[in-house]
């Protein structure tokens, strides 16, 4: 267990014609974050996810935000997911499952995570009576789902993010990132009684 917690910092660089991203990640950290994505509200959300998951994350992204934020947000999800996968698997000695229901004022979001080495995302916003669109700061609301999808599919984990109620988009999105962070922290909690959290014997 101590070896897993002392695992080296993961470093990833990813450059395309659309983005240039560098990442440093420690899965079992203290919630420290240094984020520069080029999109202020997205930085705030990543800081919140980091704080509540207790990972340590340094992420810098230079992207074509003069077009829009899509490439930067999605590619940050890809790189963060890749870093998590490197830090998590093989998934031995962890709880595997984590869930949280997080409130922010009128908004309430539930998140359930399975660190299963299988990728899936359920993203449900039916409780928001209007189309889940618009902008919060410089972030297009539709990109929130794109971020979580990229993260889950590259981290090889399954997540269900469900809005239970909410009206304010800022509150809703922040509750989503907090719920994901808390759920991830709980799923990655070390348990010396669990050798491999699967009847298959390997994850």
Curated annotation (Swiss-Prot):
Biological processes annotated in GO: L-histidine biosynthetic process
Lyase keyword on record: yes
Broad class of the protein's primary localization: cytoplasm
Gene3D superfamilies listed in its UniProt record: Imidazole glycerol phosphate dehydratase, domain 1 (3.30.230.40)
Annotated InterPro entries: IGPD_sf, ImidazoleglycerolP_deHydtase, ImidazoleglycerP_deHydtase_CS, Ribosomal_Su5_D2-typ_SF
Pathway assigned to this chain's UniProt record: Amino-acid biosynthesis; L-histidine biosynthesis; L-histidine from 5-phospho-alpha-D-ribose 1-diphosphate: step 6/9
EC number: 4.2.1.19
GO MF annotations in UniProt: imidazoleglycerol-phosphate dehydratase activity
Residues passing through the membrane, by range: none
Cellular compartment(s): Cytoplasm
Reactions the enzyme catalyzes: D-erythro-1-(imidazol-4-yl)glycerol 3-phosphate = 3-(imidazol-4-yl)-2-oxopropyl phosphate + H2O
One Pfam family it belongs to: IGPD
Keywords tagged on the record: Amino-acid biosynthesis, Cytoplasm, Histidine biosynthesis, Lyase
Coiled-coil spans in chain: none
GO cellular component: cytoplasm
Family: Belongs to the imidazoleglycerol-phosphate dehydratase family.
HAMAP family given in the database record: HisB (MF_00076)
Protein's name in the database: Imidazoleglycerol-phosphate dehydratase
């Amino acid at each position: 267990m101590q070896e897993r917690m002392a695992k080296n910092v993961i470093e990833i660089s990813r450059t395309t014609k659309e983005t240039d991203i560098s990442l440093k990640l420690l899965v079992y950290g203290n919630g420290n974050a240094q984020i520069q994505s080029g999109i202020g509200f997205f930085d705030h959300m990543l800081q919140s996810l980091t704080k509540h998951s207790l990972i340590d994350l340094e992420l810098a992204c230079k992207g074509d935000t003069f077009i829009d934020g899509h490439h930067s947000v999605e590619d940050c999800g890809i790189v963060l997911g890749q870093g998590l996968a490197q830090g998590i698997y093989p998934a031995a000695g962890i709880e595997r499952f984590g869930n949280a229901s997080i409130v922010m004022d009128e908004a309430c979001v539930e998140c359930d995570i399975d660190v299963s080495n299988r990728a899936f995302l359920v993203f449900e916003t039916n409780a928001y009576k209007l189309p889940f669109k618009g902008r919060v700061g410089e972030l297009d609301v539709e990109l929130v789902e794109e971020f979580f999808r990229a993260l889950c599919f590259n981290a090889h984990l399954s997540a269900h993010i469900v809005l239970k109620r909410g009206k304010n988009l800022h509150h809703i999105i922040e509750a989503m990132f907090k719920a994901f962070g808390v759920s991830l922290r709980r799923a990655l909690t070390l348990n010396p009684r669990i050798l491999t959290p699967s009847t298959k014997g390997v994850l």
